[in-house]
């Protein structure tokens, strides 16, 4: 499948996302703060998923060897370049995650929680325990666990399966 075919096949889904009903429900700065304080985990996790794709579809190991599909490798690496080191409005290279944190601070959203959670993800073996211990609501914990599970090989880490939506919300 070519990049053009992929983009075409995603066009309808992209339109649905652009016109999602959630946007109409964000009526105040407080609503935006609340949304951002949970959505930030999706922004962070996107990079984890992207790095998993980069690991699988390009070569990030030593010794280096050419990727089996250099068109896909280039596409992934271009996305990684932009996500990891795009330029903000001041011309400073920052990751999109860091830019999102800056935007959160502009609207006085709480960034200390996500910085604490992500900051404790020092190694793969500690992630499951950190997710359990973190001050996250159940939906946030399940989101992180399920998406990390899809981006980290099972032989590297054991993450909890999503829990029923009850308990700490």
Question: Residue locations for each model-derived region?
Answer:
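Alpha-helical bundle segments that constitute or directly flank the non-heme di-iron/ferroxidase center
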Residues: 2-18, 27-65, 82-87, 146-169
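Active-site cofactor/substrate anionic-group-binding motifs, chiefly glycine-
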Residues: 68
């Amino acid at each position: 499948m070519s990049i053009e075919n992929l983009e075409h096949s995603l066009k309808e889904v992209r339109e649905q996302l652009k016109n999602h009903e959630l946007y109409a429900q964000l009526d105040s700065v407080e609503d935006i703060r609340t949304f951002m304080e949970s959505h930030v985990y999706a922004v962070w996790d996107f990079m984890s998923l992207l790095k998993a794709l980069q690991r699988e579809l390009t070569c990030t190991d030593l010794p280096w060897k050419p990727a089996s599909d250099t068109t896909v490798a280039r596409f992934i690496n271009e996305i990684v370049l932009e996500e990891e080191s795009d330029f903000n409005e001041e011309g400073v290279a920052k990751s999109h995650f860091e830019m999102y944190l800056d935007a959160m601070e502009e609207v006085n959203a709480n960034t200390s929680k996500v910085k604490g959670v992500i900051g404790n993800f020092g190694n793969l073996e500690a992630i499951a325990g950190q997710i359990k211990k973190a001050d996250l609501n159940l939906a946030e914990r399940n989101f992180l666990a399920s998406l990390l599970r899809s981006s980290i090989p099972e032989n590297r880490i054991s993450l909890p399966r999503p829990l029923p939506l009850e308990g700490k919300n």
